[in-house]
C-alpha cells in the first residue's frame, strides 16, 4: 500500500458478491462455474466500484480458495490489485501468490497440520458432507446437504481442540489458530 493511500478491506461473499441462490432482478453475473452462472454483483455494486477503486485500495477478504477467487470477472477497471483468500492465509498481488505471506501462514499452522488431516479423513468417511476438502492446505471445508447436517459435523469435533469449527448455513469450516480474516 502506498504511503497516504487508504486500504479498504471488505468481506467478499454476501457483501460485494452474492450467489445464484440470492440473485435479484438486475444483478450482473460476474462468476461462472462449469458454464453455470454462480456469482453476482448488484447493479449498485457495479455502479459504485469504479468510484471506490479511484479513492481507495480495495482488498477483498474471503474464505474462498485462490481458484474460486480468480473465477470472479470484475467489471472493467475495477479488479483489485490484491486479495486475501483462504480466510486470510493467502495474499494475492496482481493475481499472483505472495510467497512470503503464504510461507508465514504455513508456519502459523505447522503444528496443526496433523489435526487438519485427521479432520479431513474423518469428514470424508461421513455420509453427510457432499464435498470435503482442504483449502490451500490452510483449513478444512465441508458442504453438507442442510444446516442440521453441518451442525452435526461441527458438533462431533473435539470442543477442546484448538481447531475452530464454524458453521455457516450448510457449510462447516475447520480453522486452525491464526487463520482468520481479523488476524490477516
For the regions a language model picked out, list residue spans one by one.
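Conserved acidic, metal-coordinating active-site core of Asp-based
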Residues: 125-184
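Active-site neighborhood of HAD-like aspartate-dependent phosphohydrolases
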Residues: 2-8, 12-60, 69-70
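Conserved phosphate-coordination/catalytic loops
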Residues: 36-43, 110, 175-180
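Active-site phosphate-binding/coordination module
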Residues: 41-128
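A short local loop/turn or secondary-structure capping micro-motif enriched for an aromatic residue
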Residues: 26-27, 100-101, 183
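Short, surface-exposed beta-edge/turn micro-motifs
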Residues: 5, 80, 137-139
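Generic detector of short, locally flexible boundary/turn motifs and exposed helical patches
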Residues: 21-27, 46-51, 56-58, 104-110, ...
Amino acid at each position: 500500500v502506498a504511503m497516504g493511500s487508504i486500504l479498504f478491506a471488505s468481506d467478499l461473499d454476501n457483501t460485494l458478491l452474492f450467489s445464484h441462490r440470492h440473485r435479484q432482478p438486475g444483478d450482473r453475473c460476474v462468476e461462472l462455474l462449469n458454464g453455470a452462472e454462480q456469482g453476482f454483483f448488484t447493479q449498485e455494486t457495479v455502479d459504485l466500484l469504479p468510484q471506490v477503486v479511484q479513492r481507495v485500495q480495495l482488498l477483498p477478504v474471503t474464505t474462498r480458495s485462490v481458484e474460486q477467487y480468480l473465477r470472479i470477472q470484475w467489471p472493467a477497471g475495477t479488479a483489485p490489485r490484491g486479495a486475501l483468500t483462504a480466510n486470510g492465509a493467502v495474499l494475492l498481488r496482481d493475481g499472483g501468490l505472495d510467497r512470503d505471506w503464504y510461507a508465514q501462514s504455513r508456519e502459523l499452522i505447522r503444528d496443526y497440520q496433523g489435526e487438519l488431516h485427521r479432520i479431513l479423513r474423518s469428514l470424508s468417511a461421513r455420509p453427510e458432507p457432499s464435498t470435503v476438502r482442504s483449502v490451500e492446505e490452510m483449513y478444512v471445508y465441508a458442504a453438507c446437504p442442510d444446516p442440521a447436517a453441518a451442525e452435526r459435523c461441527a458438533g462431533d469435533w473435539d470442543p477442546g481442540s484448538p481447531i475452530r469449527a464454524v458453521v455457516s448455513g450448510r457449510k462447516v469450516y475447520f480453522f486452525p489458530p491464526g487463520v482468520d480474516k481479523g488476524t490477516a
